[in-house]
Amino acid sequence: MYVEREIKKTFDKIITSYSMVAVVGARQAGKTTFLKQQMSQGKNIYILFDDPDVRGLFDEDLKKFEQQYLEGNDLAVLDEVQSCKDAGRKLKYLVDSGRRLWITSSSEVILAKEILSYLVGRISILRLYPFSYEEFLTAKGQKKMTAPVALRMMWEHMQYGGYPKVVLTDDPELKETILQDLYETMLLKDVARTFSIDDIDSLEKFARYLAVGPSGILSYDTVSNALGISFRTIKKYLDAMEKSYFIIRVYPYFSNKRKEIVKQPKVYFIDTGLRNIIAKTRNKEPDGMLFENYVCTELLKCGILAKYWRTKTKTEVDFIVEKSSGVVPLEVKLHAEPGKIERGLRSFIEMYHPKNALVVTYKGTHGQMKVNGCTVSFTDVAGMQQQLIEMNNVEPQLRPEYIKKIKKIQQSGNYTEFSSIKQLRDEIENKKKRPS
């Protein structure tokens, strides 16, 4: 079963302007399946660079590689080409020679300066993550649901994650087996091998610490004392895991450096199913840490890289979404009562005076309240992104075409098409510049 991905509309626009497009993301997130579905009628070829013969030919004789694989084809999909010798220069040559190339990558090696420096202006990069909640519901054939069914669906998505193979498997034990295999492959191949990490035992302990350790801001001192590893090793592990789409680091939002912590990140897993298999948890309901991780990944999948806010007095807001209309503080709660907000959210509102704030709850508490002129909306995960888009409707500097486009998106229900008004403006302005 093929599930249409939310990046398709963006992808369709990009391929009209770029001869080279890279789709990057975690292993088994669906990159290859997505690109194969987009390959139109005609002469196309899919080339897997895990094959040592293919890799060797590309490394040693580019002309012969071109003749053997690319001649006569309108499009070539190059799977994991980025780790080949001198990949950036060779890809530049192929594109400048008129080749149309799509690339997949399971790590951000493709974004390394020694590769990307050759491809500036020639390549567009899209990120594909495991299924979002909306994609998950599509895969499950769920359209109109009662509240209990919707909650059960969300818990399944949170418990086992969004990797397509896991989602499309019904047996819970098989789901866990697939996740365990995926974890081991990602850790050994994508993290350890790609980034030259030899101490696998130490890396595994670090991954488990992130999954089960204390929530909140990552303290290098605490990790170092708990695991007996140096700050340098911690940083190397974090860099490798993030570049392999294993974790994501969320950094602080600040304006007053003297009052707020400005360096230490929070760490979340790209997929909550992966986190749970590492932590070996079998809960029947989410805890606060898991739900917070889930909200972070859902924001990420719709193009929003949030920040967090915390002062030295430990006043905190879980996520801060920066939008062109201003910042939106976002508090994550398993349960919330409309009319009551946490001290941290109230402090942020008093300090920064945002127009809007969100309290995202697991069981879908709904309602609104006013705090110092700020509209605080209580919603669930499914309504979170819609709320973020709708907040921009009141932006005073919006020109009519932006408002018209937003309304069209709202009517279609496809709220993942644009994650910010800036993205919307860029899309419209680029369209104006294209020759008719």
Where is each model-derived feature located?
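Accessory nucleic acid-recognition modules appended to NTPase machines
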Residues: P172-V327
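Short glycine-rich substrate-engagement loop in P-loop NTPases that contacts/grips substrate
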Residues: I45-L75
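Small, basic N-terminal interaction modules of short regulatory proteins
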Residues: M384-S436
